[in-house]
C-alpha cells in the first residue's frame, strides 16, 4: 500500500514522530513524507497519515497552511482517501491539539474515510511523543495490508 505521511511541524516534534512512523511502515509499504505537502502531489488512492503539532491559538503549523487552505477553499472530493491523524499539543492550552482536530474534521467533511481514531499526544505528559505514536501504530498497522 502507498502511504503519504503529511507533516505539520513548528518545532520539530511532529517531524520526529513522522520519521519514526515511516521507519515502521516502510518495511511493508511504499512511504513518502511530505514536509511541505502540496495537494496535487499526493496520491489520492493512498493512505494519508497526518502528523501535526498545533501552533499559536490552535492553528495548523505554517508549513501545512497551504495544504489546509487548499482543502478549505477548493473542497476536493476525498472519497478515495483513507486517513488517520496524529495530533500533538500541550494540554496547558485550551486549544489542545486544535490543528489535528481541524485537519481530521476537514478530511472527514470532504469524504475521506477515517481508518483509526485520532491519536492526541500531550507533550506535557509524554516528553518523547514518538513513543505513544509508535505504540498506537503498532497496535493496528497490520490492518493496512487488508485495506
Locations of regions flagged by a protein language model:
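FMN-binding flavodoxin-like domain, especially the glycine-rich phosphate-binding loop
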Residues: 4, 12-16, 24, 28, ...
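A short, well-structured beta->alpha microelement
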Residues: 28-40
Amino acid at each position: 500500500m502507498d502511504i503519504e505521511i503529511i507533516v505539520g511541524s513548528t518545532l520539530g516534534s511532529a517531524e520526529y514522530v513522522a520519521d519514526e512512523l515511516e521507519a515502521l511502515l516502510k518495511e511493508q509499504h511504499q512511504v513518502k513524507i511530505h514536509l511541505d505537502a502540496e495537494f496535487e502531489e499526493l496520491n489520492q488512492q493512498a493512505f494519508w497519515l497526518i502528523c501535526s503539532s498545533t501552533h499559536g491559538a490552535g492553528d495548523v503549523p505554517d508549513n501545512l497552511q497551504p495544504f489546509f487552505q487548499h482543502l478549505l477553499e477548493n473542497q476536493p472530493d476525498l472519497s478515495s482517501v483513507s486517513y488517520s491523524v496524529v495530533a500533538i499539543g500541550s494540554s496547558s492550552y485550551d486549544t489542545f491539539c486544535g490543528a489535528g482536530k481541524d485537519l481530521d474534521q476537514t478530511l472527514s467533511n470532504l469524504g475521506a474515510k477515517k481508518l483509526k481514531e485520532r491519536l492526541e499526544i500531550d507533550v506535557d505528559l509524554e516528553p518523547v511523543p514518538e513513543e505513544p505514536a509508535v505504540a498506537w501504530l503498532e497496535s493496528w498497522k497490520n490492518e493496512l495490508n487488508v485495506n
